[in-house]
């Protein structure tokens, strides 16, 4: 019975796999991961942590969308456990609304791992407040025109 089911399962599974191509002209995975790390850590999180929200918003596509799940379980300052913000100008406004709370908490965002795909990547990061408090989260980012187009963050 298993011998007949397994090939059917494999065929069905393979239908959903994306075609893979390799090219010598493509940058290595390490180069792309480093580029995406810089985009995420330095251009996005460091700008947010430093209060430079306009610089942070410069890495966003005009039609960007953020899906943000509450990372700190005890964080009652975030209005909702889940927030969906669409459009670069609305995201900048949302960041400005969050800035006072983030500054008061002293939180910093630290990217730990970046996994690279084709115009998208996932990451694992930690947000730290003071010496003792931290919360890990994971995220997924899709790029368009080398800018953040889709950004989803959930607790780890």
Regions found by a protein language model. Name each.
Residues 1-62:
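Short, low-complexity N-terminal intrinsically disordered segments enriched in polar/charged residues
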Residues 1-25, 99-156:
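A beta-strand edge to alpha-helix "cap/lid" segment located at domain peripheries
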Residues 36, 44, 56, 60-61, ...:
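Hydrophobic beta-strand residues in large extracellular and virion-surface proteins
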Residues 36-38, 65, 86-87, 133:
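Intrinsically disordered, low-complexity regions enriched in Ser/Pro/Gly/Gln/His and often acidic
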Residues 47-48, 76, 98, 144:
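Short, isolated positions within intrinsically disordered regulatory regions of eukaryotic proteins
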Residues 55-117:
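A solvent-exposed, acidic/Ser-Thr-rich amphipathic alpha-helical stretch
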């Amino acid at each position: 019975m298993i011998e007949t089911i397994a090939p059917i399962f494999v065929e069905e599974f393979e239908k959903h796999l994306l075609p893979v191509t390799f090219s010598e002209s493509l940058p290595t995975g390490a180069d792309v991961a480093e580029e995406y790390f810089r985009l995420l850590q330095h251009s996005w999180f460091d700008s947010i942590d430093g209060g430079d929200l306009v610089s942070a918003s410069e890495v966003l596509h005009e039609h960007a969308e953020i899906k943000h799940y509450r990372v700190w379980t005890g964080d009652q300052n975030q209005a909702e456990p889940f927030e969906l913000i669409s459009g670069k100008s609305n995201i900048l406004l949302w960041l400005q609304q969050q800035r006072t709370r983030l500054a008061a908490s002293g939180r910093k965002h630290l990217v730990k791992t970046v996994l690279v795909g084709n115009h998208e990547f996932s990451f694992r990061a930690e947000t730290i407040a003071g010496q003792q408090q931290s919360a890990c989260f994971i995220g997924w980012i899709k790029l368009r025109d080398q800018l953040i187009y889709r950004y989803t963050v959930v607790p780890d």
